[in-house]
């Protein structure tokens, strides 16, 4: 498992953060979930293919416990995505299916629901359901016999200010950063004390691609810093010391190039890539050449 993958999981694994995400993103701000209602669930499952046993791992999984009966009523999975995944519905089916498979001998079944937290600056352009992933179909079969499976994708960089203000956990600062990074290219942090300082900085480092967030952790811990504005001041001081540009700006051209690169790898057509990146055909051809692939026209 890569270090970046681990960093993305840490913050959401805290029950106060997971409950807050459910309350804001899923329940529109209603405080229906409490941290005490959530318990750790196994993120690892196994399946057999080609006669061999394989292992798959979710990012985070939480059981929702009924207070009255102490029974599991739901398993909530959380998947953190910094990039668009064209096969995300297939991954989610695999995770959810494994959770249902594990219940085969249970007297009663609980539901399994997965939430995809997408931290990219561009809209999620990939399929959000199984049928959107299918390329080959038998036209002799009616649609009524075809099964589908949708995924729940939440675009963190496109949350409204009203939604951001609803957050009561540290996830507020991550959402705030992603939205401001997309709209302003510069981050002006709000006030407030951060509870999970280490986890917030590691997640910001992972979703922004900027290692300075994680590199200031020793300074933050030594100085007892626990507010975002104080940590950003330390971040900028470190950036200046390394001769980097002040602030949290990312070059628009670099961002567009990186995004186009991922879309070209995914086999997306030129028209779709240009819609999201505004790059010229010549530039896209240069990127494709560097990847040793052909553009899809």
List each language-model region with its residue ranges:
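Elongated, amphipathic alpha-helical interaction scaffolds
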Residues: 1-297
């Amino acid at each position: 498992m890569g270090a970046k993958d681990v960093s993305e999981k840490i913050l959401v694994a805290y029950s106060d953060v997971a409950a807050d995400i459910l309350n804001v993103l899923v329940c529109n701000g209603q405080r229906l979930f409490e941290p005490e209602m959530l318990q750790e669930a196994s993120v690892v499952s196994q399946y057999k293919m080609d006669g061999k046993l394989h292992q798959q791992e979710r990012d985070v999984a939480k059981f929702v416990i009924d207070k009255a009966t102490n029974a599991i009523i739901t398993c909530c999975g959380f998947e953190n995505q910094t990039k668009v995944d064209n096969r995300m519905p297939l991954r989610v089916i695999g995770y959810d299916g494994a959770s249902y498979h594990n219940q085969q001998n249970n007297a009663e079944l609980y539901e399994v629901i997965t939430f995809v937290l997408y931290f990219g600056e561009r809209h999620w352009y990939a399929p959000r359901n199984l049928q959107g992933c299918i390329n080959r179909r038998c036209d002799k079969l009616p649609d009524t016999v075809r099964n589908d499976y949708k995924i729940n994708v939440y675009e963190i960089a496109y949350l409204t200010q009203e939604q951001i203000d609803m957050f009561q956990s540290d996830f507020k600062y991550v959402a705030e950063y992603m939205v401001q990074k997309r709209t302003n290219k510069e981050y002006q942090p709000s006030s407030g004390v951060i509870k999970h300082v280490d986890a917030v900085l590691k997640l910001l480092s992972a979703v922004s691609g900027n290692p300075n967030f994680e590199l200031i952790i020793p300074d933050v811990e030594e100085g007892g810093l626990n507010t975002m504005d104080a940590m950003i001041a330390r971040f900028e001081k470190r950036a200046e010391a390394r001769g980097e540009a002040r602030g949290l700006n990312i070059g628009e051209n670099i961002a567009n190039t990186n995004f186009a690169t991922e879309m070209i790898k995914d086999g997306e057509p030129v028209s779709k890539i240009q819609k999201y990146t505004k790059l010229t055909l010549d530039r896209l051809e240069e990127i494709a050449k560097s990847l040793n692939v052909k553009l899809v026209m």
